Amino acid sequence: MADKEKKKKESILDLSKYIDKTIRVKFQGGREASGILKGFDPLLNLVLDGTIEYMRDPDDQYKLTEDTRQLGLVVCRGTSVVLICPQDGMEAIPNPFIQQQDA
């Protein structure tokens, strides 16, 4: 039993390769932000620097607008993190599940 207690829990994600790189984070409730990853812990609490929040459309909470807000240095609570992805190589594509209306 002593061996089990001493066994350290490992995080499901290896975020060490993203240290000092820009990542994008989605949170419960729909908020999104991107910033430079400065630190993290096994509970996925994140420290982001130069953070930018992407504002949502007031009429449609699931749609992001072009508006942003500068937040600077932030600590993101791991329990509210839904998705983490690298900013490099990410591009927006049209939703393939929505029927495109012909004009």
Curated annotation (Swiss-Prot):
The keyword Repressor does not apply. The keyword Acetylation applies. One of its GO terms (molecular function) is U6 snRNA binding. It is found in: Nucleus. It comes from the Eukaryota. Pfam families: LSM. Keywords: Acetylation, mRNA processing, mRNA splicing, Nucleus, Ribonucleoprotein, RNA-binding, Spliceosome. Its main location: nucleus. The modification N-acetylalanine is found at residue 2. CDD domains: LSm7 (cd01729). Residues 10-90 form the Sm domain. GO terms for cellular component: catalytic step 2 spliceosome; cytosol; Lsm1-7-Pat1 complex; Lsm2-8 complex; nucleoplasm; nucleus; spliceosomal tri-snRNP complex; U12-type spliceosomal complex. One of its GO terms (biological process) is mRNA splicing, via spliceosome. Belongs to the snRNP Sm proteins family. Component of the precatalytic spliceosome (spliceosome B complex). Component of the U4/U6-U5 tri-snRNP complex, a building block of the precatalytic spliceosome (spliceosome B complex). The U4/U6-U5 tri-snRNP complex is composed of the U4, U6 and U5 snRNAs and at least PRPF3, PRPF4, PRPF6, PRPF8, PRPF31, SNRNP200, TXNL4A, SNRNP40, SNRPB, SNRPD1, SNRPD2, SNRPD3, SNRPE, SNRPF, SNRPG, DDX23, CD2BP2, PPIH, SNU13, EFTUD2, SART1 and USP39, plus LSM2, LSM3, LSM4, LSM5, LSM6, LSM7 and LSM8. Plays a role in pre-mRNA splicing as component of the U4/U6-U5 tri-snRNP complex that is involved in spliceosome assembly, and as component of the precatalytic spliceosome (spliceosome B complex). The heptameric LSM2-8 complex binds specifically to the 3'-terminal U-tract of U6 snRNA. This is U6 snRNA-associated Sm-like protein LSm7. It comes from Homo sapiens (Human).
